[in-house]
UniProtKB/Swiss-Prot annotation:
This is Head fiber dimeric protein. It comes from the Viruses. The keyword Acetylation does not apply. It comes from Bacteroides phage crAss001. Keywords: Host-virus interaction, Viral attachment to host cell, Virion, Virus entry into host cell. The keyword DNA damage does not apply. It is found in: Virion. Forms short fibers at the surface of the viral capsid. One of its GO terms (biological process) is symbiont entry into host cell. GO terms for cellular component: virion component.
Amino acid sequence: MKRVLNLGNLSRIVEGDPNEITDDEILVIKDKIIEGKIIDIQKRVDGKLVSLITEKYTYTINPTPADAIVVINGSTTKSIRAAKGHTVTWSVSKTGFVTQSGSDVISGDVSKDVTLVANPAS
């Protein structure tokens, strides 16, 4: 559910579910701990939400085997966009292989190769 915070001539400023944001709206993301603090403002460009105030970087995991399951910050995905200083937690798993996991702090674009090894118990 989204809530309109302000109605302008060219766009609406809203907060809520990012999936509901249209091309003519600006999404305001508030801090969940500090009341009233805005941590990001985003707008949809070419179908994707991009930050207007914080620089974002791409964090990608390239798993071997290629069909391994990659989970980044709790979501099954091989790539995310995150702000500098953000901690990313990840895991790569596949039946018959030893799961690998870890965390990294974003400081720029990352393309991380993760190779799983066969589980000797399988």
